[in-house]
A protein has these predicted regions:
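Phosphate-binding site of ATP-dependent enzymes
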Residues: 141-237
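C-terminal active-site "lid" helix and adjoining low-complexity regulatory extension at the edge
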Residues: 230-277
Length: 277
């Protein structure tokens, strides 16, 4: 049974050079607030496996793309699953945590997602487009993303990358959840400055869209971000379901929503650590 103040190992790469944002500021703020309720230590993702046995739970936050330390992450994941270590988010997520296969699965299942294939013979299944997006299955932060012609997309589509039509969207919007509870939404009104986010008030239809993916993923405890784009016909299409270490852009929300998010995270984390519903 965890102590009255559970021990949390908080995993973050404070020096990760994110474009247009400072991951470290967000984690400095979050850890300062979590310390009000938990005994907390912070470590680099490369050190997590060696340290985690001394803690009641591991919280993975802004740890950077796992491509930069894939062998280390795979070892951490294997050891945590074998030992039954409580990892927040749980390592059973079906979104980005497991790679980009879910984009293919959701496309095949008819979900409202940017259509995605990985084989040249499946390109005819995509809407006709003048340009196509090619990206790696384990990509993050646009690492390895290319915009190419149809011929180049066909050459690249060998099963190791994903191919999507280039969507001329109006804007991108993100929905942030703790467990299955919606917290806030942000959008990038200027497509040429996609890192500059502003508060967004979602409609009931917007929230219904986002909740479809939260329900599909069945992550009972944790933080998820549903990234979408507003297509030319006005509909929303899923771009990414981030369930490993979603950046939260807490600096873009007001104090009231920031405090509400922290409170929701504390409640979720305590329930997760104690094993309560």
């Amino acid at each position: 049974m965890p102590a009255e103040r559970p021990r949390i190992l908080y995993v973050s790469d404070l020096a990760y050079p994110a474009r247009g944002r400072r991951y470290c500021d967000e984690d400095i703020h979050l850890t300062s607030r979590l310390r009000e309720d938990f005994d907390l230590a912070l470590c680099h993702p490369r050190d997590a496996a060696a340290l985690m046995d001394a803690f009641d739970a591991v919280v993975v936050r802004n740890s950077g793309p796992v491509l930069g330390y894939l062998d280390v992450y795979d070892d951490f994941r294997r050891r945590a699953l074998a030992a039954g270590t409580r990892v927040y988010n749980p390592l059973t997520g079906k979104g980005d945590m497991a790679g980009k296969q879910y984009l293919l699965d959701l496309t095949a299942a008819g979900f409202p997602v940017v259509p995605t294939v990985d084989r040249a013979e499946d390109l005819p299944l995509l809407p006709d487009a003048g340009r196509y997006v090619v990206k790696p299955r384990l990509g993050a932060d646009s690492i390895g993303l290319r915009i190419v012609s149809r011929d180049k997309a066909a050459e690249a589509a060998d099963g190791t990358v994903l191919v999507q039509p280039h969507v001329d969207f109006a804007y991108e919007v993100s929905f942030y959840f703790v467990d299955d509870a919606f917290q806030y939404a942000l959008y990038a009104p200027h497509t040429d400055r996609r890192w500059q986010l502003e508060p967004y008030e979602p409609t009931a239809a917007d929230l219904e869209f986002a909740r479809r993916f939260i329900d599909w993923n069945t992550v009972r405890h944790g933080i998820q971000r549903v990234d979408a784009c507003r297509a030319p016909d006005g509909s929303l299409l899923l771009v990414e379901l981030e369930d490993l270490n979603p950046y939260l852009s807490l600096d873009a929300v007001d104090d009231t929503r920031r405090d509400a998010f922290v409170a929701a995270m504390k409640t979720s984390l305590r329930r997760f650590v104690t094993g309560s519903a």
